[in-house]
């Protein structure tokens, strides 16, 4: 191997990724005086959080009665009873505080007449433990909420003297004596290698939507954290649960926020019928996302799709006043014009369910500490490593995430990780020294990939993986499609060793970067389809046609997947059923969140 010189950096904390969770963690660490570095492969305000449109859920009660227990109930039901009770309680209870903090940091929320934060209805958010009408819980900054939060957190992080390493690509974690002690990075603009030694590494690397052919995710969403964790011999959790957003623009997959339905938009089929009324009589178009995506898919299957190929649906906003569209949904009007050539005030938007969110990820507790579960201790913490945001799996979303629960997940758990790091980091201790053996191992892999001279191009292999995942691990799954998908994916993953990289340079080498990203996507994709094939029930986003019912007796448990090459080993760990606070201390009545049939 060519000898790579590298520069070393010493920090208390290194955060990998600068989206909502990464920046909230970075800001929280820096505020406490911890020496904090944030390493990111794209400029912070280009992170994918910028594309989050609809809003951030918190029971502020600005538009009518609401409380954290109702929010928690909706999150439990949304998760199809796979979320961890302690994490879901923490999310719902801390949400208002986290949103008010954002307001004080300077997020320009939309306002009501009285000057309070404006909140809109969103799918699956209800009152009275699912018995009452829909609630307006989703705090919005027009339809550009993620954009507003990201810019604000980046500015605040700079103010607190966090140091940013921008356009640095994380290659691998450094593991020393069973703890994470740093991360190895490649600086894209000058080709240098950098080793960050730290007392704590926080992975905030986002999801792996790009494992699929059509996704609302940016092309940067390649599951880099999951890939690094898998290579370090740690498991990924609940990977079979992939959310399809009901309304991606037909053809491009560009997201149309659920806020469009929250503001009164509705779906129709080829007969002009508001078909959701048949499937979800109470909440109609605002049922949870997995439900709406399945209903659209059923309508298309039964021949009621629109368009020449009868292969998509319509989202109607024409009946809404143009001034409210301009005020509440300006970005959507623009996206529909650019990506579908549609004027939303005059014609419906063509939409189709599109991969949007990964409920699974790196297993953590509700403080964001990464777990290395064993048979004896399913909650064993892996020292020195945290994961937050879509990269992590706390699991607060279980088998299906509610809309607008992701932005609140980012700030609540980014903040929690900072609080916890402040407690566990010994400020007096030495920063770990460079583990040369681990750095060499990471650079050896980097060099092998850089000089790969096989017969398959990265773009071709990526496309083969994406098409297989889209076809065989989709909205509806069967034993047959999943078994075929597993076989196909094992073969595809096996071809990683036969990749060809044509550009050997180290500076702005997009061919090399995309190849490294593919080596991160592949373990995520493989774990997804293997875990899905094994789960013989339907729960949340995992809709199995051969097992249409949820089976709590056998399957209310988290899957764990260890990936090595094209081989996946599965195990399971129990769901946390205990809340943080007992009912007599003001906690939720556990009878309210006992498993029951999920009807909207």
From Swiss-Prot:
A Pfam family this chain is assigned to:
FAD_binding_2
Q: Which segment of the chain is annotated as a signal peptide?
A: none
Q: What's the superkingdom here?
A: Bacteria
Q: Provide the binding site for FAD.
A: 17-22, 40-55, 224, 390, 406-407
Tell me which InterPro entries the record gives. Answer: FAD-dep_OxRdtase_2_FAD-bd (IPR003953), FAD/NAD-bd_sf (IPR036188), FRD_SDH_FAD_BS (IPR003952), Fum_R/Succ_DH_flav-like_C_sf (IPR037099), Fum_Rdtase/Succ_DH_flav-like_C (IPR015939), SdhA/FrdA/AprA (IPR030664), Succ_DH/fumarate_Rdtase_cat_sf (IPR027477), Succ_DH_flav_su_fwd (IPR011281)
From the UniProt record, which GO molecular function terms apply? electron transfer activity; flavin adenine dinucleotide binding; succinate dehydrogenase (quinone) activity
Give the pathway annotation: Carbohydrate metabolism; tricarboxylic acid cycle; fumarate from succinate (bacterial route): step 1/1
Residue list for modification Tele-8alpha-FAD histidine? 48
This enzyme catalyses: a quinone + succinate = fumarate + a quinol
Q: How does it sit in the membrane?
A: Peripheral membrane protein
Q: Where is the active site?
A: 289 (proton acceptor)
Q: Detail the disulphide connectivity of this chain as listed in its UniProt entry.
A: none
Where mainly located? Answer: membrane
Give me the residues that bind substrate, please. Answer: 245, 257, 356, 401
Entry EC no(s): 1.3.5.1
Chain segments annotated as transmembrane? none
This entry carries the following GO cellular component terms, namely: plasma membrane
Question: What's an example GO BP annotation here?
Answer: electron transport chain
The subcellular location is: Cell inner membrane
The coenzyme or cofactor needed here is:
FAD
Question: Which keywords does this Swiss-Prot/TrEMBL entry list?
Answer: Cell inner membrane, Cell membrane, Electron transport, FAD, Flavoprotein, Membrane, Oxidoreductase, Transport, Tricarboxylic acid cycle
Under the subunit heading, UniProt states:
Part of an enzyme complex containing four subunits: a flavoprotein, an iron-sulfur, cytochrome b-556, and a hydrophobic anchor protein.
Give the similarity note. Answer: Belongs to the FAD-dependent oxidoreductase 2 family. FRD/SDH subfamily.
The name this protein carries in UniProt is: Succinate dehydrogenase flavoprotein subunit
